[in-house]
A protein has these predicted regions:
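Membrane-interface junctions at transmembrane-helix termini in multi-pass inner-membrane proteins
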Residues: 1-13, 205-235
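Helix-loop junctions and terminal segments of transmembrane helices
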Residues: 3, 122, 126-151, 219-222
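Residue-level signature of transmembrane alpha-helical cores of multipass secondary-active transporters
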Residues: 10, 14, 81-93, 97, ...
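Hydrophobic alpha-helical transmembrane segments
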Residues: 11-62, 235-239, 253-277
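Interfacial/gating helices of multi-pass transporter permease domains
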Residues: 35-39, 77-89, 104-127, 194-197, ...
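Interfacial segments at transmembrane-helix termini and the short loops linking adjacent helices
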Residues: 113-114, 179-208
Length: 286
């Protein structure tokens, strides 16, 4: 939906789906029917799919009416080009999103169940903190893509310039609060989970760089430089995996956290570096 300039509709659908999930989870918790826990997610995503399908169906005619086929398209050429892009995109996306899950698998193999529980609680906090910054992505990405298609590079540079400073200040504030109150935050899951405060603090640099990278990655993904974020995802997995092999035997859970942070900092650092280089070409005349 946000790919066809229906960002508001997408956001409303996602918010309603999240509300459905929260209500379902609350019901499961109050009734203590743990066997229905997975159903909360299934109902939420099914509801989101249904809303999105209905929203897109209503706008389909108005969207397609603006499309004009002025020349013949070579199907094989399009498929080949899409396959080349899709392969890198698929590998990069899988690599970046699977890093946290792979770290849990490594903990399950080499460390104890209590370590896995502590690390899972830390990742849960990180995921929650990333929720609001990620909302910016759903606005930046279609906006950058639209402006790039219109050739309005000046507007892209202006938006990037203004939002970048806001994201840095917001991210610094959030990370500072988490660092100071890490022990209290994790105690929400129980006193024994507060032992993971050191792990959470080690992950804070990765949380900070993920937050501030949102305008940079959205710029790359919304323009012709879409492959660079996927390359960064591959770098994340490679660096993290190497660190885990070297550090986990001696440093256990701390080694897992260091490896995860190292991968994120280097991989996303690469994405930010590339974005800075590319945005300079947009700012040459402004």
């Amino acid at each position: 939906l946000y790919g066809v300039d229906l960002v508001k509709t997408y956001a409303v659908n996602e918010a309603l789906s999240a509300l459905i999930m929260l209500v379902a989870l609350l019901f499961v918790c109050l009734t203590e029917k743990k066997e229905f826990l997975i159903h909360c997610y299934l109902i939420s995503y099914a509801f989101f799919f249904l809303l999105s399908f209905i929203s897109f169906s209503k706008k389909f005619k108005s969207i397609t009416s603006k499309l004009v086929s002025s020349e013949k398209i070579n199907s094989m050429k399009v498929i080949k080009s899409f396959a080349n892009y899709g392969l890198v995109s698929m590998v990069g996306t899988v690599a970046s999103t699977s890093t946290s899950y792979i770290s849990l698998i490594i903990i399950g193999i080499h460390l104890s169940h209590s370590d896995a529980g502590i690390y899972s609680s830390v990742l849960t906090i990180v995921s929650i903190l990333m929720f609001f910054p990620k909302l910016f992505t759903q606005v930046f990405l279609p906006e950058f893509s639209k402006l790039f298609g219109e050739g309005d590079n000046k507007r892209i540079f202006q938006i990037f310039n203004k939002t970048n400073s806001v994201m840095i200040l917001l991210s610094a504030l959030i990370c500072l609060i988490v660092f100071i109150f890490s022990h209290n935050i994790l105690s929400i899951f129980g006193k024994e989970f507060s032992e993971g405060s050191l792990i959470l603090r080690i992950l804070i640099p990765s949380l900070f760089i993920r937050m501030i990278s949102i305008p940079f990655v959205s710029f790359l993904s919304g323009t012709k430089y879409v492959l660079y974020p996927n390359i960064g995802g591959i770098i994340i997995l490679i660096i993290s995996s190497l660190c885990w092999v070297l550090l986990v035997p001696d440093y256990n859970l701390v080694g897992i956290a260091i490896g995860y942070t190292a991968g994120i900092v280097i991989g996303i650092g690469y994405q930010i570096f590339v974005a800075i280089l590319k945005i300079k070409s947009f700012s040459t005349n402004y």
